Amino acid sequence: MSGDFPTAARAAEILERVRQMRPRVHCLMNTVVQKFTADGITVIGGIPSMTTSLEEIESFVTKADALTVNLGTLDAERRRVIRLAIEIANASGKPWIVDPVHVDYSPSRLDFARELIAQSPTIVRGNRAEMSLIGDVPDVVRIETGPVDHLRDRTRNVSIVNGHPWMAKVTGTGCLSGGVIAAFMAVEKDALTAAASALAVTGVSAELAAQRAKGPGTFEPAFLDALSEISGEDIINHARIEHEQG
């Protein structure tokens, strides 16, 4: 991993690369938020796909540039698809992120998350309760989300101090952010920088959206508008990326 710390200028540059390169992101996503996540990836510049068909997953992951795996809705068939998708991503060297949603609610889900994390994801992302159960994961970028997002790898600790409280009142903003992280990973090999940049972009977009929204109901479409319209200047002027040596 690179030893450089992410910056607002770097985030703006990576966003421009996403818009120019239009990476394909395959999403094994919580069914509740599939459309919102797909919309977020699309407006930021990526191309999402969402199939969970066991017969199709190999083809879709092979054609994707990155994979995002969310454990929000699980059943036996979904577990088989996730295992195969990760096997294909690893075999082809594609970056992937796993979000161990609600592992604090279900021991079997926690066991499954640990099984997946043993397959060496690029990034593991969850809230404080989830990540406290996951623990340290060597050689993986670890993201703990909250009002301030904390990221770390072996040598760097970074915090993203952007966002808005309405993000917590709209179902799926975190899942959408995971999709945006995957799009950024597809064009930036430094996974911590990619993730920090993606979270800065989504956080600044949320702040800009809140300026024109009246509440959570109008915030959701305003957030998508802001993601679509955010400029490099917006990121440089408003991103708050804090870091210290690990």
From Swiss-Prot:
CDD domains in UniProt: THZ_kinase
Lineage: Bacteria, Pseudomonadati, Pseudomonadota, Alphaproteobacteria, Hyphomicrobiales
Protein function: Catalyzes the phosphorylation of the hydroxyl group of 4-methyl-5-beta-hydroxyethylthiazole (THZ).
UniProt cross-references to InterPro entries, sorted A to Z: Hyethyz_kinase, Ribokinase-like
GO MF: ATP binding; hydroxyethylthiazole kinase activity; magnesium ion binding
SUPFAM superfamilies according to UniProt: Ribokinase-like
Keywords: ATP-binding, Kinase, Magnesium, Metal-binding, Nucleotide-binding, Thiamine biosynthesis, Transferase
Cofactor: Mg(2+)
Family named by the database record: Belongs to the Thz kinase family.
Descriptive protein name: Probable hydroxyethylthiazole kinase
